[in-house]
């Protein structure tokens, strides 16, 4: 197993990994451009120039169309598409979800994918949509489980086999399904039937679905967020531990005149300017692009450039330990993404176990930053600071502080820690001049906790007049509370 | 005057304008790439391909160097640089600020700029740095004023004359200087000596300097934030009413191996990936770029692509009425920019007069969004809602609400308004599911104000359990307060 997916770098739940397939190694996180075997807006072999390392296509479409099927069986999938790198194939589950039935069995489509040389084979699972009755979700999950067990027995080649996690919008079902599949040792775990959540901007629920599935899986397994192709939510999904995405969006959106950016979608018809630096947008004006004969192709190219630039930014952010800063910025693009961000941090206790102990300087980006894993971790380890005697707590040096036994620094959103640690991660954090309410909530709570842990010490708290928070009163009960202005006069 | 600068679109303090110069019309906001007359990383004539519409160069350097001076005087500035579009010239003020003196008088350098055919002429003002004594700032400002008055008398051609606003970090001096210059009718107003503020990330003070200067100037005059070339802070500066920037950064940063993005700067040496979609970054890997023979030039090109893409995004955001959403997102790039954002909204009452009455859907991006001009405006006009009889306030429909005389909607960060206006701007706002503390502060205050304005009405407030805020108690004193859960059971 470990030979197939290797994790090289980590930040929050995100990671940079190497996925080994029969046709080569793929660096994750990445997006697989969806190739329609019938119509190609941009040829598969050109995909590498945008940054694609792996493609995905639909084996059911190939299976159903005589001329495609014959070529695929005779010359192989890679020759059919004209791409010699890794190719994943879908099974017809999507068609099943749209039309209610497909004209192929699980074994038939598995065998077909194996024969044509797919690098990642997907069984014919049941994609249960969001919001169905629990009973239906459970029943369909049982069918999916049977088919996946059969698939695991059926596929024994070097080709990778995907084990899709279903369970609708029931986190408990997703987690249960995931832990069951974990024991069957699939090589890749797609999270299925999440497209309707993304289409209706239900990012908070999407976060719960991903987190629940991840909790059931081994953290060392690669996870594919099936159907996710909009770069706007890649950072959020990567932070939760998704490694693979697939984009039909680049082409479908281009067909509709939709222009993808990492902050959302524009309609080309409504653009006065092309707000992007890609080769297409640097060369054409919005007006020229609208009138171009190959408008759809150019738009598809722009969409791919924008998509892969976001992947590179995400990978760089993981390297720099800045993934959550990126997530917090991206999630400002839409209030529903902000809901997703807030939901992400309800899982901070779980995320914390993956988050590196030391990383790039913490940047405070907003109230949600107060709930990041490293802030939580700080609050859980306050007992390591043992304080005795007289202790002064202040945001920055004050007169006469050397008369105290201990000098402590207060810094939101963390709390109170020994002044000598100011330059140490995470206390070297870059924070705004005056903390938000939420940052004060965390840091004042942690300060109260520290005081409670050290009942023998005598605390003096130098308060800033900008600290407007009900917990200040609480601090006043446990410490001598002096406002900075009054202190100066003492 | 109005013929020289025409404002076409507005959003917050930002605008899209047309600046007419002897060598053509420039659409603002825009950046003027700085051309060093001695060394050119990228040739002036190529600048158009990146999106540049106007260049800036230093007339003092040309004046001081025999061979440049001769060509400029004989063939003109435009022939010297090989660019037939608008060119602004600096006067030597920068050299004055660095070396303490220059070997030219105000009249000499003005006359020289006029003769060589500069499109925007800059007098030899005194760039007073931040943090000097008030006395010095005042004295230098007096000298600057004299020189600008002389310049205004001296330059009477069709060439545009710039009147730089100085005053160090004293907002009152900046505003005073600006109102004085307003009466002298310059065509362009640079805000001078702000580079040290930007270099040390003092964005909050920069905001105050810009706002103070703008308050003194006519809102119809074009403003140039002299020395600002990093795209990270363009959106913030544009929202305050800056129209022109100049970038030496694209070349200076390239020389140092620094890679510009709209979210900050990377060192090429430390990049594993190129997190951008521009023609350079789509073609090269980080490793290849580091090893390229023309690394500096390629990096300069990337820096220009990134810079002008941000300008296009800003212009599109103004068109869409989404400039403040962009500002709020960009200001997450660094906590000091977040300080700048918070400071921006301390000027909301002033910004509100420029902000269109109706624009694109309001997106809530964080606590600062609660202080946007449109939220402030709503709070100032509560008297237009006259409420009588029984009134129910709720976030979404509840049972039995039709028994009330008036049905009102509560939506943070705004407050309470008639339910029939839910789909009207700004109440059609996209907001997170649960409001932040700051959003509750604004909306609950406005609700209390509405109740006070309508003492005859009987209010019932259906409260959500997620609303944790001290003002809820206040609401309880003025209205019947019922939690949604309890209401269901009634």
Swiss-Prot record, chains A, B:
Binding site for Zn(2+): 276, 278, 281
Known pathway: tRNA modification; archaeosine-tRNA biosynthesis
Alphabetical list of SUPFAM superfamilies matching this protein: Pre-PUA domain, tRNA-guanine transglycosylase
Keywords assigned: Glycosyltransferase, Metal-binding, Transferase, tRNA processing, Zinc
Its EC number(s): 2.4.2.48
UniProt-listed GO biological process terms: tRNA wobble guanine modification
Pfam families the record matches: TGT (PF01702)
Residues spanning the signal sequence: none
Binding-site list for substrate: 125, 193
Cofactor: how and how many bound: Binds 1 zinc ion per subunit.
Catalysed reactions listed for this entry: guanosine(15) in tRNA + 7-cyano-7-deazaguanine = 7-cyano-7-carbaguanosine(15) in tRNA + guanine
Cofactors that this protein relies on: Zn(2+)
Alphabetical list of InterPro entries matching this protein: ArchSynthase1/Queuine_TRR, TGT-like_sf, TgtA, tRNA_ribo_trans-like
GO molecular function, one term: zinc ion binding
GO cellular component, one term: cytoplasm
Presence of keyword Disulfide bond: no
Active site: 90
PANTHER family with a match to the protein in the record: QUEUINE TRNA-RIBOSYLTRANSFERASE
NCBIfam families assigned: arcsn_tRNA_tgt (TIGR00432), tgt_general (TIGR00449)
Function, as annotated: Exchanges the guanine residue with 7-cyano-7-deazaguanine (preQ0) at position 15 in the dihydrouridine loop (D-loop) of archaeal tRNAs.
Similarity comment: family membership: Belongs to the archaeosine tRNA-ribosyltransferase family.
Name of this protein: tRNA-guanine(15) transglycosylase
């Amino acid at each position: 197993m470990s030979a197939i997916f290797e994790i090289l770098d980590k930040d929050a739940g995100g990671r940079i990994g190497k996925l080994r397939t029969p046709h080569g190694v793929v660096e994750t996180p990445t997006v697989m451009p969806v190739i329609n075997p019938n119509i190609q807006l941009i040829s598969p072999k050109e995909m590498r120039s945008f940054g694609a390392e792996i493609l995905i296509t639909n084996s059911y479409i190939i299976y159903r169309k005589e001329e495609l099927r014959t070529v695929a069986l005779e010359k192989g999938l890679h020759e059919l598409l004209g791409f010699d790198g890794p190719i994943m194939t879908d099974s017809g589950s999507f068609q099943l979800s749209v039309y209610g039935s497909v004209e192929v069995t699980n074994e038939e489509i598995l065998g077909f994918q194996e024969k044509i040389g797919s690098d990642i084979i997907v069984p014919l699972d049941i994609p249960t949509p969001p919001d169905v009755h629990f009973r239906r979700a459970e029943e369909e999950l049982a069918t999916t489980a049977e088919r996946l067990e059969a698939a695991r027995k059926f596929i024994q080649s070097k080709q990778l086999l995907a084990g899709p996690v279903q369970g609708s919008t029931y986190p408990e079902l997703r987690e249960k399904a995931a832990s069951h599949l974990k024991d069957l040792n699939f090589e890749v775990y797609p999270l299925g039937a999440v497209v309707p959540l993304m289409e209706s901007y239900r990012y908070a629920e999407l976060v719960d679905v991903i987190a629940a599935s991840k909790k059931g899986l081994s953290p060392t397994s690669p996870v594919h967020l099936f159907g996710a192709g909009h770069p706007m939510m890649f950072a959020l999904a990567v932070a939760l531990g998704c490694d693979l995405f697939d984009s039909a969006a680049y082409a479908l959106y281009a067909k509709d005149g939709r222009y993808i950016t990492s902050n959302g979608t524009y309609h080309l018809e409504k653009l006065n300017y092309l707000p992007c630096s890609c080769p297409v947008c640097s060369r054409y004006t919005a007006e020229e692009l609208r009138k171009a004969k190959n408008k759809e192709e150019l738009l598809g190219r722009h969409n791919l450039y924008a998509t892969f630039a976001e992947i590179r930014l995400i990978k760089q952010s993981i390297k720099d330990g800045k993934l959550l800063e990126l997530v917090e910025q991206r999630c400002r693009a839409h209030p529903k993404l902000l809901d997703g961000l807030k939901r992400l941090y309800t899982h901070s206790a779980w995320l914390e176990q993956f988050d590196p102990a030391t990383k790039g300087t913490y940047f405070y980006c907003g109230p949600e930053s107060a709930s990041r894993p490293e802030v939580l971790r700080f609050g859980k380890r306050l007992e390591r600071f043992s304080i005795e005697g007289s202790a002064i707590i202040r945001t920055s040096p004050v007169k006469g502080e050397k008369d105290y036994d201990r000098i402590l620094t207060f810094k939101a959103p963390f709390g109170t820690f020994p002044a000598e640690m100011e330059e140490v991660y995470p206390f070297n954090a870059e924070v705004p001049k005056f903390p938000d309410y939420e940052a004060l909530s965390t840091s004042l709570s942690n300060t109260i906790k520290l005081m409670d842990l050290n009942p023998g010490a005598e605390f003096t708290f130098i308060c800033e007049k900008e600290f407007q928070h009900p917990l200040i009163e609480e601090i006043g009960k446990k410490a001598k509370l002096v406002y900075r202005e009054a202190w100066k006069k003492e």
